[in-house]
Every structure is written in structure tokens, then in C-alpha cells.
Amino acid sequence: MHARHAAVTATTESPCMASLMNRVETLRWDDHRYYHQCRINQTLHLVSAISFLVAYAWLLIDPAVSALIGWCVGMVTRQSGHIFFEPRGYDQVNGASDAHKEAIKVGYNMRRKALLIGVWLALPLLLWASPGLFGLITPGAGGYLHDLGLLWLALGVGGLLFRSVHLCFLRSPMWALAWALKILSDPFHNVAIYWRSPFALLRGERLDPIEAGHAPRSA
């Protein structure tokens, strides 16, 4: 009975949905093998993923606090792993130079991340200098941090939408949707594949023994 149900499900699965999920898996695998070889980086991504899951839950309570958690904990730990610990230079595992990996990066490569982080760092200063952001917003009753959280939330949503629309023209709407889905589901996926990384790091394993063509196990 179960086999029959699985067969029916497989035959009735939308080709469009299958194509979308294949793209998501391709993006996930390329992201892992190219940019997450260091166990320290993986561990920081685990911390980041957990904080983003907390931020997701806090969206229902207070979106401003959710954004503060996501940016100050999630993004700081995530990008620290990339900037300070992930190997740069020639990638022996995948046979690719750092310049090549930066050029083919679907989402935010280091140059685009630098621009995004620059805006993120500038917003607190701008809001401090002008609580009304030079007439663009009305200061809320929640105070400086609450307004900052809402601005950072707008920045995060805007960054996701901007790159998604950009990818519609660079690649296709399907790739844009796949990237957006991959980004939004990254916290769940990162927990699934990186929960072992702290234990591997404690054993002295600094680099993940990644094999080209083999995706990481999630359980």
C-alpha cells in the first residue's frame, strides 16, 4: 500500500516543482562544497541557523526584535565564519580558484556582501543622527532599537527581493525562486547538515573531508 502511494506521488509530482527542488539542491550543494569546508565556519553556521530559527519564531511576536536577533547574532556569526575561517585561494577539492567561485556565486558574493554589510552598519549611524531618517520615517514609540530593528528587517527583505528580481534577468524566474527558497530554508538545512561539526572540531578535524559530487548527510 505504501509503495503504491509512493508510486502515485512520484508520477503525479509536478515537473515544475521537481525542477525547482532540483535547482534548490544544486544551490545547496554548491554552497556547501565551495564555501563551507572549514569546521569552524560550519559550527558558526550552526549557531547562526539556530539564531535565525529563533528570529523566525519571534517574527510573530515582535518583528523588530526578530531582525535584531537575525542581524546581530545570525548574520554576524555567519559572515565571521566566511571572512575569518573559510579557506581562500585555490580550492584543491573542487579545482576552482577563489576568483572563479566569486564569479559564479549565485547569491551574494564577498563584494556584494560588503555592500550589504556597509548599508547594515550605516543604518544605526544614520538613525542616531536623524531619528526620522531625514523625513523618510516617523520615529516610533518603541525607541531607537525598535526603529533600528524595523529598518534592518526592511534591509533584509529588500536584499532578498532585490537579488531575486536581479536573478530573474540574469538567469530565469525559476532560478530566482530557487535561490530565494534556498535562502529562507537555509537555517533548517544548516542545522540538519552541520549539527555534527562541533563534535568533529573537538576531534581536531578543522576541514570537512568533502568529496566532490557527494552531498553531506543530514542524519
PLM regions with names:
Residues 61-86, 158-170:
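Hydrophobic alpha-helical membrane-embedded segments
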Residues 14-32, 83-107, 165-219:
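Membrane-proximal soluble regions of multi-pass membrane proteins
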Residues 147-168, 187:
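Alpha-helical membrane-embedded segments
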Residues 54-69, 125-150:
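Helix-coil boundary and interhelical linker segments in multi-pass alpha-helical membrane proteins
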Residues 3-6:
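Short hydrophobic alpha-helical segments enriched in small aliphatic residues
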Residues 119-140, 204-214:
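Alpha-helical transmembrane segments and their membrane-interface junctions
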Residues 109-133, 192-199:
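C-terminal halves and exits of single transmembrane alpha-helices
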Residues 26-56, 101-117:
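Membrane interfacial helix-start motif at the N-side
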